[in-house]
């Protein structure tokens, strides 16, 4: 039981791990160099390591809800099932991007479909185990790689009244890749944080009451991530702090044209040593991301 509690104390990152490898010459492989295949874990946003060449990641996360979780009138538990189809592009020639993005600007592309369950432990506590398996392609090196990742996310409701709803977030995460003709790599991480949501009085959007959603999380990487930023220097990252702000509806998803979002906002990420920074779109809670 103690080990199980420790397991729940962790999980969700790697989403920022490796697209920075675009700036690394292929004949140089520093110890534990971040591989481009890890770009599949990024959310849509701008990423930078120590003012080195920036990378923009565009992640399309379509998903299909097969069944929603909850408890029926008899108290029987219903496990939610969600099928995910994330398609990720890594863009590395930012100065060359015109008004309309062309394929020549793409450094990487990956497709990693997966399944995610939502298990309601009780009325306050829910778990989300998930697994994704797919492949990616890097244009400059003409390299393919198998990609897989999975983990367990936890959300525990600490309080809910008319003024504020807040929850404890935890997660553990494990991911890996296998390039052609090269050895495989693996990464693990653990996350803990708090999530808040409060109504915005009489403010509405599209006839629906608005809520202000925000969270703060800390993610620890079990292994340092090394980024080769120039010929003489490698920067290492061991953790990530993240703050997210967003607006959402009280009872249903937000919608722009035909695309639905849980919420709309931004998140800011940085490492403790200040070498890594990122600004990402904040479209879902870390629990349902």
Placement of each model-derived feature along the sequence:
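Transmembrane beta-strands of outer-membrane beta-barrel pores
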Residues: 44-46, 64, 87-95, 119, ...
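Transmembrane beta-strands of outer-membrane beta-barrel proteins
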Residues: 77-85, 127-131, 148-150, 164-172, ...
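Outer membrane beta-barrel transmembrane domains
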Residues: 91-103, 204-289
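Short glycine/proline- and aromatic-enriched beta-strand/turn motifs that initiate or cap beta-hairpins
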Residues: 21-98, 289
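Short loop/turn motifs that connect adjacent beta-strands in outer-membrane beta-barrel proteins
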Residues: 65-82, 119-127, 159-167, 200-211, ...
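Residues that define the transmembrane beta-barrel architecture of outer-membrane proteins
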Residues: 52-62, 79, 105-111, 144-150, ...
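Residues on the lipid-exposed face of transmembrane beta-strands in outer-membrane beta-barrel proteins
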Residues: 58-68, 111-119, 133, 152-158, ...
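Detector for outer-membrane/organellar transmembrane beta-barrel domains
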Residues: 143-226
């Amino acid at each position: 039981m103690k080990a199980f509690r420790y397991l729940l104390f962790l999980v969700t990152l790697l989403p920022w791990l490796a697209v920075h490898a675009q700036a690394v010459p292929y004949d140089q492989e520093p110890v534990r160099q971040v591989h481009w295949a890890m770009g599949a874990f990024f959310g849509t946003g701008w990423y930078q390591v120590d003012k080195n060449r920036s990378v923009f990641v565009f992640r399309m996360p379509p998903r299909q809800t097969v069944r929603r979780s909850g408890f029926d009138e008899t108290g029987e538990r219903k496990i939610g099932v969600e099928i995910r189809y994330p398609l990720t592009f890594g863009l590395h020639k930012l100065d060359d991007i015109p008004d309309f993005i062309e394929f020549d600007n793409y450094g990487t592309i990956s497709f990693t479909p997966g399944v995610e369950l939502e298990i309601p432990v009780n009325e306050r506590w829910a778990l989300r185990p998930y697994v994704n398996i797919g492949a990616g392609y890097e244009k400059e090196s003409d390299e393919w790689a198998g990609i897989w990742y999975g983990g367990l996310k936890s959300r525990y409701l600490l309080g809910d009244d008319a003024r504020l709803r807040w929850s404890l977030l935890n997660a553990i995460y494990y991911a890996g890749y296998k390039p052609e003709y090269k050895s495989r790599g693996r990464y693990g991480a653990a996350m803990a944080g708090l999530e808040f949501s409060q109504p915005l009085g009489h403010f509405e959007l599209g006839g629906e009451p608005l809520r202000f959603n925000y969270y703060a999380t800390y993610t620890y990487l079990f292994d340092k991530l090394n980024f080769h930023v120039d010929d003489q220097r490698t920067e290492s990252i061991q953790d990530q702090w993240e703050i997210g702000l967003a607006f959402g509806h009280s009872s249903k998803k937000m919608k722009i044209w035909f695309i639905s979002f849980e919420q709309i906002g931004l998140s800011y990420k940085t490492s403790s040593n200040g070498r890594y920074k990122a600004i990402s779109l904040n479209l879902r809670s870390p629990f349902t991301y």
